[in-house]
């Protein structure tokens, strides 16, 4: 039977990608259905209880700048906040928050249930309705047909999910949840390239059985940070510490002597695991010369004793897991509440996607999250927001949108995926972005909120706060530029004493702020009243001190913009372009790049080949002009 309502967008899956996709679509005024196998697991943190980190917090801030939920939920559920790379420059600084799983999930659900234009329905999706290479809707587990203009798949690890603990395995989407088998089989019938990946999680420990006195305490930063541009410290629950301990020679001996019982090393697991979040058995095997590895003991929440031992993800048998845990200092008497496990799942080659995250072969079908080969809540949320936005734009008859590599880490993420593909779970790092001085986490709103407002993603409250902040930055820059300090005055003497050399002539405060010897707060302390908003002061200082570097990056971006944005026709025949090698013809034909810039980033496509493409496009354009004039 048919569902009572027809929707413009259906989102399948209620994880981090699915919630952001559904919220984005609904915020844009589009009638949206979020289909989940279990309403109680909406926004669930399936792995580590943390949001942010190097490269990842940049994505979280960008999601927030575009009106998304992840950062706001983190502020409501965050039980510890820290800045990583705090001694390095602003481009690579990152915010990381430990989150209470229950509070985070509750915050996400509250946002979902109060979002206009969004309906939630508990049913697994078993089939897609596809007609003439266009998606028309979905079929649920109980046979309901629900029609829609666009469908966003955010299936996480559920497609053909297989859980491994030692040599035993069973079907599952994650521990305690069933897999999606029927949908996985249906997707394999489509002309899309499919593979298998693997991820894992450590055993959870009862904190009452742990001796923290022999571990190193790791408190949060003070003053306490916030994740959202609209967040406040008052939203945070109680703050707690994490703890650090280490594996040792005994731990490594236990693992090495049991590798034959590991599904990874016995050939049972075929999927490739995440390079930057390896299992403990992988660490011991790959880094055999290391005497120990750090283990971060992270609280799962304020109302539970469960701990997450970050650093010992494993799929070894339970008896070996128990030996490993109890060999670690402070956990000699530890009780395991939940065993660790590995999970294999289907993913689809992201090179079969457009920049909008719509599949190239099925119109209106969008993929986001782990189905595209990524790992991490933040990467999933960023893709979900983009896919949901573009599904809504399609329903509205508007052009799709994706930020460029020089505009957002979201743009870097998508460009990497659809141009290069991935054979292992993809994780974001600041090192992946060539314009990271411009793409800082602190200026995500200045980069994206105006575009979010144009798309319909940003509400009135966020827009008003953003406009106030932007105006305050401009006013403070103007004030500093128009305020002068002269030699021999009280302010001039104070500045001279700070620098250790006398001022030789008058300077405005903006000139003085460019000097490395002084920061904004010191300058204001010496010269009088400044800006009360620390976020405004931070922007003024960074823009002033790094102005030369930022200008050079902007000039480089402008030079490359013309070729970057040159569109390649969808029907272009690369085999007919004289001078292109068969290898390059094949690579271009497989990837089907959308722009000249994307083509230039395909491995093996040379600058000479790009020149040939430019010549071909000019000839093609001239030829069509002649046809039209005739």
From Swiss-Prot:
GO biological process assignments: tRNA methylation; tRNA wobble uridine modification
Sequence positions that bind FAD: 13-18
InterPro entries with a match to the protein in the record: FAD/NAD-bd_sf, GIDA_C_N, MnmG, MnmG-rel, MnmG-rel_CS, MnmG_C, MnmG_C_subdom, MnmG_C_subdom_sf
Gene3D superfamilies: FAD/NAD(P)-binding domain, GidA associated domain, C-terminal subdomain, tRNA uridine 5-carboxymethylaminomethyl modification enzyme MnmG/GidA
Major location category of this protein: cytoplasm
Coiled coil: none
Any Pfam family: GIDA
Keywords per UniProt: Cytoplasm, FAD, Flavoprotein, NAD, tRNA processing
Gene Ontology terms: cellular component: cytosol
Location of the protein in the cell: Cytoplasm
Residue numbers binding NAD(+): 273-287
Subunit structure: Homodimer. Heterotetramer of two MnmE and two MnmG subunits.
Annotated function: NAD-binding protein involved in the addition of a carboxymethylaminomethyl (cmnm) group at the wobble position (U34) of certain tRNAs, forming tRNA-cmnm(5)s(2)U34.
PANTHER family registered for this protein in UniProt: GLUCOSE INHIBITED DIVISION PROTEIN A, PROTEIN MTO1 HOMOLOG, MITOCHONDRIAL
Sequence similarity: Belongs to the MnmG family.
HAMAP family named among the record's database cross-references: MnmG_GidA
Protein name as annotated: tRNA uridine 5-carboxymethylaminomethyl modification enzyme MnmG
